[in-house]
Design a protein with these regions (language model features):
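An N-terminal hydrophobic leader/cap segment in hydrolases
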Residues: 3-51, 57-62, 66-68
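The serine-hydrolase catalytic nucleophile loop
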Residues: 86-99, 112, 249
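Alpha/beta-hydrolase active-site loop
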Residues: 92, 123-143
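Conserved alpha/beta-hydrolase
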Residues: 97-119
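Hydrolase active-site cap/lid region
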Residues: 162-220, 226-229
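Short beta-strand/loop motif that positions the catalytic acidic residue
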Residues: 231-232, 237-240
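Conserved alpha/beta-hydrolase "acid-adjacent" motif
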Residues: 244-250
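Catalytic histidine-centered segment of alpha/beta-hydrolase-like enzymes
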Residues: 269-280
Length: 294
């Protein structure tokens, strides 16, 4: 019996570590910034809407000028949904709204589940967040929007790539800093936290497997590299900094996508830093892409 216990102890420790890591990476993320479109002179409406699995989410609706806040939009029936990164909230990306709004787009931002002011206890790296994006699409349809684009950053880009195949209303996607495989990005983060690389990889795999068991789903089947090819024939525009440590497998992601696709790759730029280093060119390219496809 003593020998058996000693044999089982390492197994138990490994499983416990995997479970603890699973709870850590899926934990709720508090609101970490406080901004409103009013800071940029934009009229807006704070809204509560439902993900398609019923969870209540908090959003921010910025219609084109001259539109009723609570009714159908007047003017262009096109909108862009901006999707924030992991640990963030819609507050992070409100500064991106003015350029799109000025270009004639209605803009919608929201907090993902388990982030900011939205309900939910689990951040699932795209698996359940697909339903958040679906809910946002339904909200926009209720305001008369007919053509929708999605602009996602990092975690938000993952959600964009997983949700667009099940959202026929989405006509164009911009994915900035979206990993091909979330487990690769988590492994990199673990190494940054001083975990040995030889341990970080297996521990991440175990954490994803444990999270899969908690959700009753195989999250390995819900990696962007497996879904991005289903976006076509709608276009996708990738933005990638060559120094992005969280996306070392960008070539896999781009290869998996089907035409029409394009990529803007920049040397010497890190994770989701393109818009900071080249703000004017970023705005020009993104607006041009949506103008051509919405």
């Amino acid at each position: 019996m003593t020998v058996l216990l000693w044999l089982l102890l390492p197994v138990g420790l490994v499983l416990a570590t995997g479970l603890a890591t699973s709870f850590y990476i899926t934990r709720r993320q508090p609101r970490s910034a406080f901004h409103t479109p009013a800071e940029f002179g934009l009229e807006f409406e704070e809204v509560t809407f439902r993900a398609t699995d019923g969870l209540a989410l908090q959003g921010c609706w910025i219609p084109v000028n001259g539109s009723s806040m609570r009714g159908h939009v007047n003017g262009p029936k096109r909108a862009v949904i901006i999707l924030h990164g992991h640990g963030g909230s819609l507050d992070w990306d409100i500064h991106r709204a003015p350029a799109l709004h000025e270009a004639g787009f209605n803009v919608f931002l929201f907090d993902f589940r388990a982030h900011g002011r939205s309900q939910g206890r689990l951040a699932t790296f795209g698996y359940l967040e697909r339903y958040d994006v679906q809910g946002a699409v339904e909200f926009l349809k209720s305001r008369g929007i007919q053509s929708i684009g999605v602009l996602g950053f990092s975690y938000g880009a993952i959600a964009a790539m997983l949700s667009t195949p099940i959202c026929p209303e989405v006509r164009a996607v911009v994915a900035d800093g979206g990993p091909a495989r979330m487990r690769t990005a988590i492994t990199v983060r673990a190494v940054e936290l001083h975990l040995p690389r030889w341990l970080a990889g297996p521990l991440t795999w175990l954490a994803v497997a444990t999270t899969s068991a908690r959700l009753g789903a195989n999250l390995f089947q819900y990696e962007p590299v497996r879904w991005v090819g289903k976006i076509a024939p709608r276009p996708i525009f990738f933005i990638h900094g060559e120094l992005d440590q969280y996306v070392p497998d960008f070539d896999d992601l781009y290869t998996a996508a089907n035409d029409p696709k394009e990529a803007w790759r920049l040397a010497g730029v890190g994770h989701t830093k393109v818009s900071e280093i080249y703000p004017d060119e970023f705005r020009r390219r993104v607006i041009s892409f949506f103008d051509c496809n919405l």
